[in-house]
Amino acid sequence: MNRITSLFGIKYPVIQGGMVWCSGWRLASAVSNAGGLGLLSAGSMHPETLREHIRKCRAATHHSFGVNIPLMYPQIEEIMQIVVDEGVRIVFTSAGNPTTWTAWLKQHGITVVHVVSSSRFAMKAEAAGVDAIVAEGFEAGGHNGREETTTLCLIPAVRAVTSLPLIAAGGIATGEAILAMRALGADGVQVGTRFALTEESSASEVFKEYCLHLKEGDTRLLLKKLSPVRLARGNFQQAVAAAEAAGATEEDLRILLSRGRAKRGIFEGDLEEGELEIGQVSALLNEKGIQTVAEVMDELVTGYQQACETLAANVCERWDV
């Protein structure tokens, strides 16, 4: 066991990202049943829908699971009360100030993890009293940090300023990547894109198949005047890029985003007008196809073990100094 498996009561230090329109009870329970930590995404659920998913997830697994809550959620008070009322034991917070809710959640016996994109925000999260930190790099899909720091650079930077349990996120889809993050100082990893494209994900099959054919360079980080989002190539990505190049104001960009674009793209599979949020690592998955969560977890665990053995046998030679 390590600090992440001990903190959450799980077998493997692998957390499934709480992704809008992907992370419902089927995905979260499947990840938890496979030995990781499944997360429900409150960001794309009405409060009572979240309550329903919490109950269905609990019925589908006797293992630990949690809820990811964007702190900018418009009905945040109602969402927070629901997770307390439903007995949720683990909450990941993101997109907001962790000082607002951390103490209240911990008073109710909830383990709190906050997602950051820089060492500066990591220090603020630790000061707020969180139990662990997710450091998410530039490679990640969906909402991202303004710093544009890659995971390779971010993890050691965050490790240098905090002793809290640290979870690496962004661009992680293989066992080898997990080992790399461990070498950089992370105690565990959060995997988004790989789980978003599984059978149990609530994303549209059209969206999944589209993302499994993306190539390097097919995703871009846009909407930096608002909240940076990594988007896959398509009409909406082109429209946003053109608007930004033409000097669009924040209000102009909000109008572009105001028609439920993420739901249309991810959940409904509208490749023409929808917002297609996915990570850079999708380009490594072209040969995978849509897999089950169990298959993905087995590949991650086996790949990690094999990478450890390969390094021990062939790579980690001593250098004369």
Residues covered by each model-derived region:
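Conserved active-site-proximal phosphate/metal-binding subdomains
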Residues: 145-167, 173-321
